[in-house]
Amino acid sequence: MKIAYVVSSKKKCGPNIVILNIVKELANKHEMEIFFLDESDDDVFECVNVKSTQIKKASDLKEHLKRFDIIHSSGIRPDALVVLCKVIYRVKCKIITTIHNYVFQDLYYSYGLVKSLIGGLLWCSIWLFFDKLVILSKNADNYYWFLPSAKKNIIYNGIDDNDCLQNKKCNYRKEFNIPDDGILAGSCANLTKRKGIDLVIQTLTKEHKIYYIVAGNGIEKHNLINLVKARKLHERVYFIDFLDEPESFMSQLDVFLMPSRSEGFGLTVLESTKLGIPVITSNIPIFMELFDQMCLTFDIKNPSTLIDVITYAKKNRLHLSQKFHAIFQDRFTSSKMATKYENVYNNLFREVL
């Protein structure tokens, strides 16, 4: 098969990591090429021997896509361009997209009610033209009840389960003078309201021996810093910039926190579990489905419960990390994910013949 991937850019982000892991697993079996729209400082695909081509306009993409059997896009602009090529330019291939979010919730937390409704309806309309839609969970399948059932496939995300831990570039306990008996918690996120970092900050006090490091940037970062100042937690909560390789940071934590109000999947949960770090998530439905018995949870409507859960995770770290890692290997490896995507590609390819 000849498979093309169309993405917004080559920067490191959740949807691109999913594409990367599919390519890693299947590139030796199929002809592949990655098309991207925007330049970026980093290139998540540089580790794979697959050609990548920048697209400036839809007509350029049309000429490229004529060579492929399957087109797999990710993101609103790539989705729109692929549909344009399929419907307007009559490119004869099968098209598939992965829906990584809960579109109305996701856009609401970033852009507000009006833009989320307009953007969400537009994006959902675009999805109707695809031959296949990959949904990341049963919960998301129910959320998108209005999309044709025959087009939807549920495939859980997966990550590479090989050991790829880099040398420590920074000792975070030493950097922030965190005592040996302090519990070091952390999160990696694009800092928006949806990620729920404020819930953790509002729960912590100086009386607790819990220290919290937040790795990431985003529109909410300034507000979070001000919240830390208002609660006088500058000796408990610290911010560092987005990390291209977060594994070293995660490996130094006692517990990883994922306090999201809404989430499409949560790849950092898998990354932390792979490293043997216990994970605590909010009890939103998507996490309860995906990570049942693989993570600890706290009540998002009663965030004060988080303190007890963090303390429990620290005391039982060894047992929890072994238990959670075994479940990760059973459910969420990139090889399992890629096999399911390949099955979808094969079914579409038979329709092309």
UniProtKB/Swiss-Prot annotation:
Highest rank taxon of the organism: Bacteria
The UniProt disruption phenotype note reads: Loss of LPS O-antigen production.
Q: Does the entry feature the keyword ATP-binding, yes or no?
A: no
A GO CC annotation recorded here is:
membrane
Reported regulation of activity:
Activated by 5mM MnCl(2) and MgCl(2). No significant effect on activity by 5 mM ethylenediaminetetraacetic acid (EDTA), 0.125-0.5% Triton X-100 or dithiothreitol (DTT). Inhibited by 5 mM Zn-acetate.
Q: What is its main location?
A: membrane
Molecular function GO labels:
alpha-1,4-glucan glucosyltransferase (UDP-glucose donor) activity; glucosyltransferase activity
For this protein, the parts annotated as crossing the membrane are 116-136
The temperature dependence reads: Retains 50% of the activity in elution buffer/20% glycerol for four days at 4 degrees Celsius. Retains 60% of the activity in several days storage at -20 degrees Celsius with 20% glycerol.
Provide the binding site for UDP. 190, 271
Give the subcellular location: Membrane
Q: In which pathway does it act?
A: Bacterial outer membrane biogenesis; LPS O-antigen biosynthesis
Pfam families attached here?
Answer: Glyco_transf_4, Glycos_transf_1
- Description of pH dependence: Optimum pH is 7-8. Retains 24% of maximal activity at pH 5 and 14% of activity at pH 9.
What does altering residue 263 to A do?
Loss of glycosyl transferase activity. No activity with UDP-Glc, UDP-GlcNAc, UDP-Gal or UDP-GalNAc as the donor substrate
- Sorted UniProt keywords: Glycosyltransferase, Lipopolysaccharide biosynthesis, Membrane, Transferase, Transmembrane, Transmembrane helix
Task: State which Enzyme Commission number(s) the record gives.
Answer: 2.4.1.-
| Purpose of the protein | Involved in the assembly of the O-repeating unit during O-antigen biosynthesis. Glucosyltransferase accountable for the alpha-D-Glc-1,4-beta-D-Gal linkage within the O-antigen. Transfers alpha-1,4-Glc to the Gal moiety of a specific Gal-beta1-3GalNAc-alpha-OPO3-PO3-phenoxyundecyl (Gal-beta1-3GalNAc-PP-PhU) synthetic natural acceptor substrate analog. Requires both Gal-beta1-3GalNAc-alpha and the diphosphate moiety in the acceptor.
Q: What is this protein called?
A: O-antigen biosynthesis glycosyltransferase WclY
Q: What is the lineage of its organism?
A: Bacteria, Pseudomonadati, Pseudomonadota, Gammaproteobacteria, Enterobacterales
Task: Give me the gene this protein comes from.
Answer: wclY
